[in-house]
């Protein structure tokens, strides 16, 4: 654009500035007064050309060219000082500033913006500083929260009761503890101290062992039986092996009815159905099994109960009794006869051994030794005569 249109555009862009036109050979050239700075173009966009992004008018200032050589650094220090970055730049001499920052255009923009506007490099450097400060504050908050959590967890762990390691007893310690338990289930303080000295265990461990041992003993010993036989074999095994009577609770329930009893399988005879309803007249037949045996054992006196397992039962057959008598007759050989037979057998074995090793024994003597062996075997196998039985005590 040239001529009047260019002048009009320049006037519209900078109405506050007064320009004078000088004609040099038919061409118009604007002459700028020394008091106003030359117009600066911020950009070539539509908004910049139309003046939509026009900056507010500033006070007139002297051109940079009128300033002396050292005034550029002073002006820069005065502007950059309040922003917080002029301290570092003030220490640098005029020759130390880069050529780009020492140009009048840079200082001109600084002077034009004034103290309120911060430099763009300063803003760019200040934002990371703020971000670093925020990150550091966040990290401090996290570290403080982690410390609080760690302290709370430590306090909780201290509050919780530490789990004690399980005590492993040696065989000697268990033997001593069992001996003391057989003597007294509730040992006094003196007994516990003596056990602690013997077993080298703390007294509280001994007390806990006795508590556990008493609980185990109560579990084994039934409250209605109170016998080690009941604990070993249970109800069925104790009744079969040792003829222990049934508990009173089962007997009372059997009087009301077998099906209503606690253990009908112990009352009903083998081979009879349990689900069937029985009348009271049929109860004796049902009680002919294990219940009958338990009732007989309950009716016997105390002295007879001790001897009952040793006495032969009346239900044994005659063949079994005969076999027992024969075995008893064979076992009635006197001790002297058994001793003589064993001595003779040892002598015969010694002679055979010497004959084989030394070869000094004649074959006739070997035959005699064999005959003696056979005679001893016949004596042991033959049952004793009735006269010998009478002689023997």
UniProtKB/Swiss-Prot annotation:
GO molecular function: DNA-binding transcription factor activity, RNA polymerase II-specific; transcription cis-regulatory region binding
Top-level taxon in the UniProt lineage: Eukaryota
Keyword Transcription regulation: yes
Residues spanned by motif OAR: 341-354
Gene Ontology BP terms: regulation of DNA-templated transcription; visual perception
First-listed, main subcellular location of the protein, grouped into a coarse class: nucleus
Record InterPro entries: CVC (IPR023339), HD (IPR001356), Homeobox_CS (IPR017970), Homeodomain-like_sf (IPR009057), OAR_dom (IPR003654), VSX_homeobox_regulators (IPR052294)
Ranges for region Disordered: 121-165, 304-393
Keyword Transcription regulation attributed: yes
Keywords: Activator, Developmental protein, DNA-binding, Homeobox, Nucleus, Repressor, Sensory transduction, Transcription, Transcription regulation, Vision
Compartments, record wording: Nucleus
UniProt xrefs under SUPFAM superfamilies: Homeodomain-like
Ranges where the CVC domain occurs: 222-296
SMART domains: HOX
Membership in a protein family: Belongs to the paired homeobox family.
Main function: Acts as a transcriptional regulator. Mediates the differentiation of V2a interneurons. Plays a role in eye development and organization of the neuroretina.
Full protein name: Visual system homeobox 2
Organism: Oryzias latipes
């Amino acid at each position: 654009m040239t001529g009047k249109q260019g002048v009009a555009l320049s006037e519209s862009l900078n109405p506050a500035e007064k320009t004078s036109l000088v004609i040099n050979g038919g061409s118009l050239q604007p002459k700028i007064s020394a008091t106003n700075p030359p117009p600066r173009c911020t950009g070539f966009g539509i908004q910049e050309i139309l003046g939509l992004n026009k900056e507010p008018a500033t006070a007139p200032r002297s051109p940079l060219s009128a300033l002396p050589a050292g005034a550029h650094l002073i002006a820069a220090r005065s502007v950059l000082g309040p922003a917080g970055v002029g301290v570092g730049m003030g220490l640098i001499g005029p020759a130390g500033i880069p050529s780009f920052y020492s140009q009048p255009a840079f200082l001109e923009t600084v002077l034009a913006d004034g103290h309120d506007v911060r430099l763009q490099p300063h803003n760019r450097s200040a934002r990371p500083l703020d971000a670093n400060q925020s990150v550091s504050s966040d990290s401090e908050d996290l570290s403080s929260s982690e410390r609080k959590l760690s302290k709370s967890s430590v306090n909780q762990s201290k509050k919780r009761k530490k789990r004690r390691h399980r005590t492993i007893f040696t065989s000697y310690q268990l033997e001593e503890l069992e001996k003391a338990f057989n003597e007294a289930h509730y040992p006094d303080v003196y007994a516990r101290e003596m056990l602690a000295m013997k077993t080298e265990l703390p007294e509280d461990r001994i007390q806990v062992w006795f508590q556990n041992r008493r609980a185990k003993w109560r579990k084994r010993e039934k409250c209605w039986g109170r016998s080690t036989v009941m604990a070993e074999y249970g109800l069925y095994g104790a009744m079969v092996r040792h003829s222990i009577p049934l508990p009173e609770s089962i007997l009372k329930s059997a009087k009301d009815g077998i099906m209503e009893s606690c253990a009908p399988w112990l009352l009903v005879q083998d081979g009879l159905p349990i689900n069937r309803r029985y009348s009271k007249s049929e109860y004796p037949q049902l009680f002919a099994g294990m219940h009958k045996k338990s009732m007989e054992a309950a009716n016997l006196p105390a002295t007879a109960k001790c001897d009952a397992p040793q006495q032969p039962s009346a239900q044994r057959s005659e063949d079994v009794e005969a076999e027992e008598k024969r075995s008893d007759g064979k076992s009635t050989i006197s001790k002297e006869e058994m001793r003589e037979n064993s001595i003779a057998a040892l002598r015969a074995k010694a002679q055979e051994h010497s004959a084989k090793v030394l070869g000094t024994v004649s074959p006739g003597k070997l035959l005699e030794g064999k005959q003696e062996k056979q005679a001893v075997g016949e004596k042991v196998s033959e049952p004793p005569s009735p006269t010998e039985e009478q002689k023997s005590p």
